[in-house]
Amino acid sequence: MLIGGQAVAIWGAQLMTYLPAGQAPVTSRDVDFQGERSDVELAAQLLGGRLYVPRFDDVTPQTGKAVFVDSEGYERTLDFLAEPHGLIAEDVRRTAVPIRIAMEDGREIPLWVMHPERCLRSRVANTSLPGKRTALARRQLDAAIQLVPAFGRFLLDEGIDPRVVTKLNERVFELARYDKNAMRLWLEDGIDVLDALLADDRLPEAHRATRLPQIRAEVAKQRDHRRAVIARRGDG
């Protein structure tokens, strides 16, 4: 299952027509998958590559990596992690979405990709890691914020029950209201994960007219409270 920045990039390509006009494609230097050691072994075998697994005393979230040479002669690395930082493996696995990647030769490759909303949570969680406050990480975070409403619009166009999309909005609310990294991003960088909310005329009127304003008001109240706490500490 594809996770990390490459999942954000794949979703950006898949949902391009649902994203704001002019939004630049996001890239990723890494190709990360969620998987156990057996998955790493299988990948190395299928690709004719080399297998690397952490030693017992290695402090790493990786379960291993497969290094192989692609069809153009370039060495590539696939990193496998037990779970994305800040997320739970079983939840990521349960909510992953199957897509098909169109190849230049006309083939379509099936691929499981981390859910767009979990991509957002992953990008937010990563901001707490050393070395993850880079310009590239910021672009990936900004892109992930836009992916969630884009995915919601896609679901509505596909005729999916609007309640699925309102649940996405509730997940965004939970992230903005309770996640300490999301709060820090708002306070320190002005990054608002509530921009991932979708207000669409196809959603129930009660959700648009009542629930969304409630969400914004409750998060604003919590942010004001946090600012006041910080200010009092500064005065002390």
What are these regions (language model features)?
Residues 1-236:
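Compositionally biased terminal segments of proteins
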